[in-house]
Structure formats: structure tokens, C-alpha cells
Amino acid sequence: MSITAERKQELITEYATKAGDTGSPEVQVAVLSERISNLTNHFKSHKKDNHSRRGLLKMVSQRRRLLDYLKEVNHSRYQVLIEKLGLRR
């Protein structure tokens, strides 16, 4: 259900805007998207896991807020990110 430290580090290096960048919206959205994807796969076999479903909804909301912020601050970075992640918007 959770992502491994190696996978998280790969995402950080791929989406970082500079060296050592772990807090930019791009990195946070990429990590959240990976976690959301893993939880979505989890729900295919565990349909009644409502406790984890609440966590999924919180992650989706957090990602939405980060994307809204990025869209407001720098629309070009927002466009690049949703294209790279394959998010529909």
C-alpha cells in the first residue's frame, strides 16, 4: 500500500526543480499520485476497506489543493506536471 523509499527517491529526483528539492509542489504531487495509485489498486481487491478509503480521499484532496496552488502561481509548470503525470484536467 505504501511506496518504498527507493521509489520515493526516484520520484523526488525526477520531479525536483533543483538538487535537494523535496518540498516543491511538483515533488509533492508526484509522491501523492504514486500513493493514490497504489491505494486505488488496493481497493480492487479490498472493496470494504473504508478506513483506508478515507485516507485516499484526504490524499486526493491534498493533491487537488497543491495543483490549484501551482496553477495559480505558475501555470506553465502546472501544465508540464499534469502532462508528465498523465492527470486529466
From Swiss-Prot:
GO biological process: translation
SMART domains, A to Z: Ribosomal_S15
One cellular component (GO) term of this entry: cytosolic small ribosomal subunit
GO molecular function: rRNA binding; structural constituent of ribosome
Highest taxon, organism lineage: Bacteria
InterPro entries, alphabetized: Ribosomal_uS15, Ribosomal_uS15_bac-type, uS15_NS1_RNA-bd_sf
Keyword Manganese: no
Keyword set, alphabetical order: Ribonucleoprotein, Ribosomal protein, RNA-binding, rRNA-binding
Membrane spanning residue stretches: none
SUPFAM superfamilies, A to Z: S15/NS1 RNA-binding domain (SSF47060)
Function: One of the primary rRNA binding proteins, it binds directly to 16S rRNA where it helps nucleate assembly of the platform of the 30S subunit by binding and bridging several RNA helices of the 16S rRNA.
Subunit and interaction comment: Part of the 30S ribosomal subunit. Forms a bridge to the 50S subunit in the 70S ribosome, contacting the 23S rRNA.
Family: Belongs to the universal ribosomal protein uS15 family.
Protein name: Small ribosomal subunit protein uS15
Organism expressing this protein natively: Bartonella bacilliformis (strain ATCC 35685 / KC583 / Herrer 020/F12,63)
